[in-house]
Amino acid sequence: MSLDASIFSGGHGHPFAESTAALGEILEERGWRTRVLLTLEDTVASLPHTDLLVVNALYWSMTQHEKYAPFRERLAFWASDSQIDRLESWVGAGGRLLAMHTACLCFDTQPRWLGLLGGGWTWGVSYHPALGPIKVELTDGGRFELVDEVYHHLSPRPEAEVWARGAVNEGPQPVVWTRRYGEGRVALDALGHDRRSFDAPAHRALIGRLLDWLAA
């Protein structure tokens, strides 16, 4: 396959410019040509020319708590049915999707997004402890430590193959998994709060393995 990657980046509460730059470096080291897109509209329009879509963004309705009220006018977002239709169709026809960190919180009014990812954040159930040192265990052996967040209770679907679990509060939590969707492939890596996570050698290596699996 060719190696054209689009990175959808931006949103609330995270240093997306720096984490997207770090992701771009990892992709380019493995031969991917990258472009960064800042709206879902442009991202969906790019799909016919994209082999891999990376979502490193946080856009959702912001209706769950009044603490988000000051940000709603500028950042609240509702993905349309047609946008989700096009994402599903693109992956199902053979597209590759890598969802990073907050991608599993996006598009909360569209349950099909989590269906495509094979699981993700459930408002009122999922949560994360404060950013800090965490331990990650790989299901095929090995472990590493880094500074990041461990999302709890993401509930991967039965079709998801868990690659890694993170531990900080309630015991090991699935934080990295893959799944097939039609002719396409999807990987979710719920790590990656900021550049420190992407600069951790073991996490970079894990992302590299995910990219290899996606490109297969």
Language-model features: locations:
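Short, flexible loop segments at the rims of nucleotide/cofactor-binding pockets, characterized by
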Residues: E29-R35, E73-F77, D140-G142, A164-A167
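Aromatic-Pro/Gly-enriched surface loop or interdomain linker
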Residues: M1-L52
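Catalytic beta-strand/loop cores that center a nucleophilic Ser/Cys/Thr
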Residues: A21, R112-R196
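Residue-level signal for short, function-critical loop segments
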Residues: G11, A103, G192
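Extracellular ligand-binding/catalytic regions of CAZymes and related secreted enzymes
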Residues: S2, S19, E29, T39, ...
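Structural motif
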Residues: D51-N56, V186-A190
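A glycine-rich, often tryptophan-bearing local segment used as a flexible ligand/cofactor-contacting loop or short
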Residues: W60-G141
